[in-house]
């Protein structure tokens, strides 16, 4: 029997429209070079309509690794615990005989009922999800990475994140064309790659599952040489945004909060000022740096792919490439992953099956969601997909194409209650449990339903960039009602069903599949 390996690559904050394979297929300007991702696209299937079902990092990774919508796993924001009862991918893989290795992070806060309130994991943004075997952790506080840098003889600054200040500078106003202080040999992308190669060499050809995480192109937006100068700002696509931040802010109260509150310091180490006031030249420079960080990750992936080639494991390995969420990059005068706009939620997904790929090079337009990754991996390994899982296996797409009964809409959610570094709830004067939205989006329309704020409705055919809210337009009233009904039906259909397939009866306990 052929051995089965799984390499799950999870990058951070890489948005879907920065995938050259798709750009070329659409006849768009190829402004980014990713030869190793290109290879994966040529040998696998690229999913062009793929979304994370929630943002930011902690909730997104909870959905990716449990196969559950936000409304079911309820780790609704960074800093919010994940209930221990949920079966995650790591635990499920142990059930099929794998010791799932993890490089990177999952930004998971533990269930407080399972440990002491004094547990140090409650003093950080997140830690590692139970079930995985860490072989190159980035959390908590990036200590493993900083220790590796110091061990290699690099003098760390007193404030360790200042390694991401530009070379020769103690502060930066915003986007910069200067290289990072840290050379590429000691970058975090190199750190993760070295950990991956060490792990794979230690396996010595035995079957493996490896979650290979990368921190980039997540901010701070500064790249090591030569990646800092690899792309010209003038070659970058311009941000898609209204003429000024006030126009964007007028669309919705939640949009106003983010336009008014996003700070440059969250994206450029040591910077001050409003993120919404970056001009086009600064945003193009930021995008050039973002592309440099992407190409650095791609070069690192090339080292991992070469090792799999050299050891004869490439054709034995299912490789999945995806991101936790996207990045606004100045679109709508926003930075980060927030709210309801497409750039925050649309992410890459590429799957290369082991051996021959019947649809090699295909670009699939079916609607897929981050919750589909966990059941796909379990299905490929012959494991049982948990009944509670909201996602669906994508294996049919690799051989035959889109199933006839596949979903016809995309679904994603966002919870904007206060956390220690952002307070939209207080700004909006809402209760904690009123701070949620869900999105139903198909090829034509996008509906955003809020628990306690006005809805949004966009006609994507005529307004693909979501500038005009039609929710209050009488001509669209019937459609708005229809999509509100779709949202309600979706939530009813996907209510927690962990035990709903079991039945008791005269013959004892039975289990139904449908």
From Swiss-Prot:
Q: Which cofactor does it need?
A: Mn(2+)
Which CDD domains does the entry mention? PMH
Q: From which residue to which does any coiled coil extend? A: none
Result, substituting residue 78 to A: Kcat reduces 10.7-fold and affinity reduces 1.3-fold with phosphonate monoester as substrate. kcat reduces 8.6-fold and affinity reduces 19.6-fold with phosphate diester as substrate
Which residues are listed for Mn(2+) binding in this entry? Answer: 12, 57, 324-325
Instruction: Quote the cellular component terms of the Gene Ontology held in the record.
Output: cytoplasm
In short, the EC number is 3.1.4.-, 3.1.3.-
Keyword Hydrolase belongs to the record: yes
Mind telling me how this protein is modified after translation? The conversion to 3-oxoalanine (also known as C-formylglycine, FGly), of a serine or cysteine residue in prokaryotes and of a cysteine residue in eukaryotes, is critical for catalytic activity.
**Could you tell me the superkingdom of the organism this chain comes from?**
Bacteria
Active site per database record: 57 (nucleophile)
Question: What does the annotation give as the result of altering residue 57 to A?
Answer: Kcat reduces 1818-fold and affinity increases 1.1-fold with phosphonate monoester as substrate. kcat reduces 2021-fold and affinity reduces 1.3-fold with phosphate diester as substrate
What does the pH dependence annotation say? Answer: Optimum pH is 7.5.
Pfam families, alphabetically?
Sulfatase
Q: Name one GO molecular function term.
A: sulfuric ester hydrolase activity
Keyword set, alphabetical order: Calcium, Hydrolase, Manganese, Metal-binding, Plasmid
Cofactor, how bound (note): Mn(2+) is probably the active metal ion. Other metals such as Zn, Ca and Fe can also act as cofactors.
Q: Which InterPro entries does the UniProt record give?
A: Alkaline_phosphatase_core_sf, HdlasePehA, Sulfatase_N
Magnesium as a keyword of this entry, yes or no, is no
3-oxoalanine (Cys) carried by residues: 57
Q: What does this protein do?
A: Hydrolytic enzyme with a broad substrate specificity acting on phosphate diesters and phosphonate monoesters.
Q: How does it assemble?
A: Homotetramer.
User: Hey, which family's this protein in?
Assistant: Belongs to the alkaline phosphatase superfamily.
Q: What is this protein's record name?
A: Multifunctional alkaline phosphatase superfamily protein pRL90232
